[in-house]
């Protein structure tokens, strides 16, 4: 019996994707996607015709998982639509590609391409949970959104209701 034959579908929940797991819980693999489309119809003054267009704004596929009791995790996320904002600018197809290690509870070391903790608060919200379809123009123009580098993130509870979440980031600066 091979190990591949023992992989089971652990769970499926709409919005969370499908999760495959080892029977002993040693590793998990999650596959999920996100699709956002736009259809516009316009009629200009002095013109009797309607102009329409259909756009695939976001078409994202994400593969993530963990192993060794959650000590090691990874994420690979792509955007096949390559649309950035509402102005048709092209962005990179690869959004996230990183591996993370948790040596102790509350501390995570990551290496690769991922979102940075140094951007404004709006960029900490994922695209599929925004209140409006687009981010603000300020965030689109001035946010770095994702960087390649080494990330050290902490999360330490202080008292009953507060957390201290320090971050240290060394990136390529693009």
Predicted region positions:
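Short coil-to-helix leader/linker segments, especially the first N-terminal amphipathic alpha-helix
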Residues: 1-19
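Outer membrane beta-barrel
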Residues: 17-173
